[in-house]
């Protein structure tokens, strides 16, 4: 029982103190352009789920322009994680506004995020 409790504590610490700040850029190279064509760098952003208190996430997103130097930005939505997350999302994405891009709404962008019990699916 002690080991189970320690394992649960380790999972909680990992989820709340480490993983939620562990953002990453995944790079993939696709050979789809004709030989000799200049590279096309695409930045795909999705599922930001921004809340107003997530300043670390906001700073990280603001730096994407200089880290990636994209030619095209594709944002596939779910940018909002809180009803007051609109301004933080706009501020975070502001450095990317001069770059051509495409945006698609996610469900969290159309409706205010609702609080849900994360264990509800276990009760079905």
Model-inferred region functions:
Residues 1-36:
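N-terminal membrane-anchoring alpha-helices
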Residues 57-124:
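Core catalytic region of metal-dependent phosphoesterases/phosphodiesterases
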Residues 39-49:
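Active-site-proximal beta-strand elements of phosphoester/diester hydrolases
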Residues 28, 37-38, 55, 60-61:
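Membrane/wall-proximal cationic-aromatic binding patches
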Residues 26, 44-46, 76, 106:
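A secondary-structure boundary/capping signal
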Residues 35-40, 69:
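Proline/glycine-enriched tight loop/beta-turn segments at coil->beta junctions
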Residues 20, 48-54, 78-82:
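Short, flexible loop segments at the rims of nucleotide/cofactor-binding pockets, characterized by
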Residues 26-28, 41, 88:
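Short beta-strand micro-motifs in enzyme catalytic cores
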């Amino acid at each position: 029982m002690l080991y189970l409790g320690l394992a649960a504590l380790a999972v909680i610490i990992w989820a709340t103190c480490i993983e939620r700040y562990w953002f990453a850029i995944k790079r993939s190279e696709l050979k789809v352009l004709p030989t000799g064509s200049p590279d096309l760098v695409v930045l795909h952003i999705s599922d930001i789920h921004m809340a107003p208190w997530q300043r670390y996430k906001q700073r990280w997103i603001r730096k994407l322009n200089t880290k990636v130097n994209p030619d095209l930005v594709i944002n596939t939505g779910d940018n909002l994680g809180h009803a007051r997350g609109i301004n933080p999302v706009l501020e975070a994405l502001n450095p990317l506004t001069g770059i051509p891009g495409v945006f698609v709404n996610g469900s969290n962008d159309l409706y205010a995020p609702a609080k849900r019990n994360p264990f509800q699916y276990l009760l079905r």
